[in-house]
């Protein structure tokens, strides 16, 4: 019977050795209306171009745009819908964290993940290190958010 030292991940379907280098996955499409973006920003990022449609018209964006924090939260939700079955132990940070274009109200976005690196842990044989490249794009293939993320993933041990 297979087991892992990371009991919370016992129900996960994909462990380190199940992950295929260069595998890609895509989320469903998602869009949010202006009201949802404003409600979030009022609580967590109350800058005028996130919360006030009239003042936002004079911003560099010319309209309401989603908070980067909101965009990141939506990315995480979409990513977990396609990669939530991985036996994650911990994320180790984010590299090249960018928001090259704003997330606009009622604009469909999609998250993609690409496994660009994987290796067994040098310190602990019960885990591996992976690096995913993540990107959120709109329907015109414009990049809304991107980053790379190293993370530890459980390995199945006997």
Residue ranges and their predicted role:
Residues 2-93, 158:
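Hot-dog-fold acyl-thioester-processing enzymes
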Residues 2-21, 99-108, 112-158:
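HotDog/MaoC-like acyl-thioester-processing domains
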């Amino acid at each position: 019977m297979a087991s892992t030292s990371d009991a919370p991940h016992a129900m996960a379907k994909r462990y380190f050795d199940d992950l295929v280098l260069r595998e890609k996955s895509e989320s469903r499409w998602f869009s949010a209306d202006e009201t949802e973006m404003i409600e979030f920003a009022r609580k967590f990022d109350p800058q005028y171009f996130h919360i006030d449609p009239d003042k936002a018209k004079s911003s560099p964006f010319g309209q309401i745009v989603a908070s980067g924090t909101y965009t990141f939260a939506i990315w995480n939700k979409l990513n977990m819908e396609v990669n939530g079955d991985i036996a994650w132990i911990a994320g180790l940070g984010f590299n090249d964290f960018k928001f090259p274009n704003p997330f606009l109200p009622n604009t469909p976005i999609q998250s993609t993940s690409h496994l660009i690196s994987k290796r067994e842990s040098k310190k602990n044989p019960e885990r591996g290190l992976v690096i995913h490249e993540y990107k959120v794009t709109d329907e015109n293939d414009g990049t809304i958010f991107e980053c790379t993320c190293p993370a530890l993933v459980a390995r199945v041990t006997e």
